C-alpha cells in the first residue's frame, strides 16, 4: 500500500469529521494478514463527547450482506464451500422447509422438493423474506417469530428462519431477505 494514499484517506476522514459531516470513524485496511492502517477519529457519541475507539461497535444493518458474500466467496476460492451445496448440508434445519401459498386468505404450507443452495442465499433466491416486505400471512409469521429482535445466537436465528415458511420455492424468485444472515 502506498503511504501517501493512506495519508490522503486519513486526511479525508479527518476533514469530514472537522466539517461535522461525519461524527467519527474507525478505519482499518489490511492485506494478506498485515494491517497497514488502523485509526480512530472523531466521536463515537457526539452528545456525550465519547471519543471513537478502535473497538467501537457500529450498527451496519444491510452492509453485512456484501461482507458475508465476500467471505463466502473467499471460502469458495479456497475450496471449502461450493455454491451448489444445499444449505441443509451445513444446517440440518433447512432440510425440511415449507413454502407458503395463500388460498382464499388462508396460508397453506407445502414441502419444498429441493432446498435452497448457498448460491440461493447469496443471490436472495432462497425463498426467505423480511417481515416488512408485505403484510401477508408469511410476513406476519416472521413478525410473530420476532426475527428482527436478534435476541439469540446466530445458530438460533438460523434455526428460527429455517422453521418459517418460504415466500417462494428456492431458486425461483428474487426476494430481498435475511438470506445472508444464515
Give the residues covered by each predicted segment.
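Amphipathic coiled-coil signal-relay and dimerization helices
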Residues: 35-41
Amino acid at each position: 500500500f502506498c503511504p501517501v494514499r493512506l495519508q490522503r484517506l486519513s486526511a479525508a476522514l479527518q476533514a469530514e469529521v472537522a466539517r461535522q459531516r461525519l461524527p467519527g470513524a474507525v478505519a482499518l485496511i489490511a492485506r494478506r494478514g498485515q494491517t497497514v492502517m488502523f485509526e480512530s477519529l472523531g466521536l463515537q457519541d457526539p452528545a456525550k463527547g465519547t471519543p471513537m475507539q478502535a473497538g467501537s461497535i457500529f450498527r451496519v444493518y444491510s452492509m453485512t450482506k456484501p461482507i458475508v458474500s465476500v467471505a463466502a466467496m473467499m471460502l469458495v476460492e479456497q475450496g471449502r464451500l461450493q455454491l451448489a451445496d444445499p444449505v441443509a448440508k451445513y444446517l440440518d434445519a433447512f432440510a425440511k422447509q415449507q413454502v407458503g401459498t395463500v388460498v382464499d386468505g388462508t396460508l397453506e404450507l407445502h414441502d419444498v422438493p429441493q432446498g435452497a443452495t448457498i448460491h440461493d442465499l447469496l443471490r436472495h433466491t432462497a425463498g426467505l423474506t423480511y417481515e416488512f416486505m408485505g403484510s401477508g400471512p408469511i410476513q406476519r409469521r416472521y413478525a410473530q417469530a420476532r426475527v428482527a429482535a436478534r435476541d439469540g445466537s446466530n445458530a438460533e436465528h438460523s434455526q428460527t428462519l429455517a422453521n418459517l415458511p418460504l415466500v417462494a420455492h428456492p431458486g425461483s424468485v428474487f426476494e430481498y431477505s435475511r438470506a445472508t444472515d444464515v
